[in-house]
Amino acid sequence: VKKLGAVVTGFEIGPQAEKYSNEFGIDVINDYFKASHLDKKVDCIFSSGCLEHIIDLNDFMKQSFKALEKGGLFFASVPNALPDFEKGSVSHLCHEHINYFTIQNSTRFLRKCGFTNCGSSTNSVGNEIFLWGYKPLKKNRNISERNELAEFEQELDYLRSYDKALKSNLSKEISALQSLVNDSNKKIGFYGGGATISYLANIQEHSRFFDGDEAKWGNKWMPGLSEIEDP
């Protein structure tokens, strides 16, 4: 985007802020996103792999709405939760995302936040959702509730099905992990997480943890676990 002539400001709460600033030659603010950090309103806010981790998502969206010029674009990329809901994925839950998105609820969420001309689509393999909306040029007084009840009921059906499949799959996965530990003297390696399932299976002492993020190396997901390693 910078190469196309845009003035870019980034936000990063981790220690990578300075590294990214130097690497990409842009201003990176080492703090949570707040409209007050910006000198003026912006034309576009882009978020990738972020919304699913934010505890107070409503406040983040309020800050984003406030920071945008009228007609400005909010664009985000988030994991698509639906495939994992449908297959009862244990790892999906243990990854500990706070917010879970589908095509239906992502668009509905943006409308609730006051954005207009909202849309969403998946990437070619269906594991990521791209969602977008625009800050209205005029105050949007009437947000359509059309079809939202039906969409909400569908979301509840997804969650009920996920709960049923998850209970079955979790028991099988715990048994499989415990069998691997009992049948050998080797440890089990987890990449990008694994803390929750290792506790549930009671195999903490037989687990190693890896992550591609250098900032995490030497730290621990939770007390009592081994340090996170360079894969």
Q: What are the language-model segments listed below?
A:
Residues 34, 118-120, 176-180:
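Generic recognition of flexible, low-complexity loop/linker segments
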Residues 1-88, 100-118, 133, 194-199, ...:
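Conserved SAM-binding loop
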Residues 48, 94, 161, 165:
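Conserved short-loop catalytic and cofactor-binding motifs
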Residues 80, 123-127, 190-196:
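A glycine-rich phosphate-binding loop feature that marks nucleotide/adenosyl-phosphate handling sites
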Residues 90-96:
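Short glycine-enriched, charge-decorated loop/helix-capping segments at active-site entrances
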